[in-house]
Amino acid sequence: MAKVGMRERELKREKTVAKYAEKRAALKAIIANPNVSDEERWEAQMKLQKLPRDASPSRLRNRCQVTGRPHAVLRKFRLSRIKLREAAMRGDVPGLKKASW
């Protein structure tokens, strides 16, 4: 299991990304707009650089909600493959059953 601090850090990053999402999108739109002057584009780039590092969505890592495991996490369930299998075998996940063909 991941340490509690790592899981808390990831939650903090999610909140930071959500907080700055609109501001980042607006600045990126200014930077990508070809009709904007070079000075305005430069100012937008500087403002974007001054935002917190954790405001970038690429800093997020999908983690298992139960264990905090960073690898093999299914987005739909937010569980790792191991915990998803355990939950499915217990019948905790509606509509999910073991494959048979």
Curated annotation (Swiss-Prot):
Keyword Membrane carried by entry: no
- What InterPro entries does the database record attribute to this sequence? Ribosomal_uS14, Ribosomal_uS14_bac/plastid, Ribosomal_uS14_CS
Record-level GO cellular component terms: cytoplasm; small ribosomal subunit
Keywords from the UniProt entry: Ribonucleoprotein, Ribosomal protein, RNA-binding, rRNA-binding
Which molecular function terms from Gene Ontology are attached? rRNA binding; structural constituent of ribosome
Tell me any Pfam family this protein matches.
Ribosomal_S14
| Keyword Ribonucleoprotein in annotation | yes
Q: Which cysteines in this chain are paired by disulphide bridges?
A: none
Gene3D superfamilies tied to this protein: 1.10.287.1480
Name the domain of life: Bacteria
Task: Extract one GO BP annotation from the record.
Answer: translation
Q: How does it assemble?
A: Part of the 30S ribosomal subunit. Contacts proteins S3 and S10.
Q: Which family does it belong to?
A: Belongs to the universal ribosomal protein uS14 family.
The role this protein plays is: Binds 16S rRNA, required for the assembly of 30S particles and may also be responsible for determining the conformation of the 16S rRNA at the A site.
Specify the protein name: Small ribosomal subunit protein uS14
Taxonomic classification, please?
Bacteria, Pseudomonadati, Pseudomonadota, Gammaproteobacteria, Oceanospirillales
Gene field:
rpsN
